[in-house]
From Swiss-Prot:
Region called Disordered, residue ranges: 41-120
Compositionally biased intervals (Acidic residues): 45-66
Coiled-coil intervals: none
Protein name: Immunogenic miracidial antigen 5D
InterPro entries: Miracidia_Ag_8I
Protein family: Belongs to the immunogenic miracidial antigen family.
Length: 120
């Protein structure tokens, strides 16, 4: 029995589990809940007034990038999406909640792109 074949089977199972976890977290009402604001805000323009009542992407604040506040799926899968005003970056696999100005029209319920690793 080929030893490398065992590793291949294990790897395929592992990848399948990751894909299952990703799709589950994207559709879970708990993991895709709105981001909780820390009350801190660095103004990035008049596109987002953080009064707590509107559909604002709090992950676009510079002070939230290294802050452990965000949707649980972001924390579980790693990686915040930095706002385009500050250079953007790679879309990490996981949940991304678009803000009002750059939103995709779905109110932040769906990821910006359906493939992981999409780059601007």
């Amino acid at each position: 029995y080929n030893h490398s074949h065992i590793h291949t089977q294990y790897f395929v199972t592992y990848v399948s589990f990751l894909l299952l976890f990703t799709s589950t977290s994207l559709n879970s009402p708990y993991l895709s809940s709105p981001v909780i604001s820390t009350g801190q805000h660095i103004d990035v323009g008049d596109e987002d007034y953080h009064d707590g009542d509107d559909d604002v992407d709090y992950t676009d604040d510079v002070d939230d990038v290294d802050d452990p506040h965000g949707s649980p799926s972001q924390l579980l899968q790693g990686g915040y999406q930095r706002n385009r005003h500050y250079g953007g970056g790679t879309y990490h696999s996981g949940y991304y909640r678009p803000n009002k100005q750059h939103g995709n029209g779905y109110g932040g319920q769906y990821p910006k792109k359906y493939g992981s690793g999409y780059k601007h």
